[in-house]
């Protein structure tokens, strides 16, 4: 059995050193045609490190270490649910377990908890992942047409009245136009919004794990001209609110003047309300449908899965390719 101390005290660093070795390549149990080992590419190593760090972060939150976590714990990790929906689909969950299995194999830990977790989740009996829902171009336009607008003003005019409606409008456009997750949108920070405007009118959003979900992968998400046209007025208003109302915090879309972070539940309700105003089916209304729509449109326009992976901040190219299976659902009758 290998020395386990470093894998418990600094597991991510230990894995970084392991993933670039022949020892890691051997655990894949795959050889080239000439019988030699296939080395892990830098890009693949980066993906593996991200996945391993994500798993270790969760394990640490449970008060466990890599060598004390059980198969039952790992089953809970890949079976997590957020907002009623799986955090990881079954294929991604399996890849996490397989990666951990390779680590335990290298360390000589028996029984192998990740292997036990895989066996406990008989893959043949797992439900098939829902291919997801997307909007047609016509449905998406109706969604944009139904976005929140300023409420009717009464006789009394209050400075910045209705600012939250303009915030909600800008946020929903950014989610739809840049393919962000709701976690990425509510955690978007002012300094992550690019100032440089490209020739096509787009700007870059630099998405980092800071204030996002623990599965957020650092990436650049281009926001096209149409999205910039909605975001810039809101950012200008937000800047004035900082000066005149002492709005706090660094969130692009704060929940209140104290600068608190919006909740995913609140954003879900707002998006669902827009779906309802647009006459769209609300049973699958949410940020995920908007992200699916963005991804499917990118693939339909000729984007390669490896390109889409980078735009969406996904760890695996195969995850990006899966968006081609999303389905467009007819409007309710």
What is each residue range found by the language model?
Residues 145-182:
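Basic, Lys/Arg- and aromatic-enriched nucleic-acid-binding interface segment
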Residues 171-172, 183-188, 308:
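Alpha-helix N-cap/helix-start motif at helix boundaries, enriched for small hydrophobics
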Residues 187-229:
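Conserved tyrosine-mediated DNA breakage-rejoining catalytic core shared by Y-recombinases
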Residues 224-282:
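Active-site/catalytic core of tyrosine-dependent DNA strand-transfer enzymes
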């Amino acid at each position: 059995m290998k020395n386990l101390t470093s894998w418990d005290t600094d597991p991510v660093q230990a894995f970084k050193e392991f993933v670039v070795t022949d020892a890691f390549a051997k655990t894949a149990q795959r050889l080239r045609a000439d019988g030699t080992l296939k080395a892990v590419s830098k890009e693949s190593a980066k993906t593996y490190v991200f996945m391993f760090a994500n798993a270790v972060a969760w394990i640490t939150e449970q008060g466990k270490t890599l060598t004390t976590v059980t198969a039952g714990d790992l089953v809970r990790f890949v079976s997590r649910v957020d907002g009623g929906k799986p955090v990881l689909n079954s294929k991604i969950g399996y890849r996490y377990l397989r990666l951990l299995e390779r680590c335990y194999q290298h360390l000589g830990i028996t029984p192998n908890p990740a292997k036990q977790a895989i066996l406990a989740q008989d893959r043949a009996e797992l439900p098939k992942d829902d291919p997801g829902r997307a909007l047609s171009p016509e449905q998406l336009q109706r969604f944009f047409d139904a976005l929140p607008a300023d409420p009717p003003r009464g006789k009394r005019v209050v400075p910045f009245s209705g600012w939250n409606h303009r915030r909600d409008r800008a946020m929903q456009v950014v989610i739809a136009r840049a393919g962000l997750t709701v976690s990425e949108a509510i955690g978007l920070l002012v300094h992550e919004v690019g100032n440089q405007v490209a020739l096509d009118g787009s700007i870059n959003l630099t998405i980092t794990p800071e204030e996002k979900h623990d599965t957020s992968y650092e990436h650049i998400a281009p926001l096209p001209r149409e999205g910039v046209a909605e975001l810039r007025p809101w950012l200008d208003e937000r800047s004035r609110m900082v000066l005149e109302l002492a709005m706090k915090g660094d969130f692009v879309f704060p929940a209140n003047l104290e600068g608190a972070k919006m909740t995913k539940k609140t954003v879900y309700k707002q998006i669902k309300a827009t779906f309802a105003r647009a006459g769209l089916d609300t049973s699958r209304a949410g940020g995920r449908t908007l992200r699916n729509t963005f991804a499917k449109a990118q693939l339909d326009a000729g984007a390669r899965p490896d390109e889409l992976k980078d735009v969406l901040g996904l760890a695996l190219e195969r995850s990006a390719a899966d968006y081609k299976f999303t389905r467009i659902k007819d409007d309710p009758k």
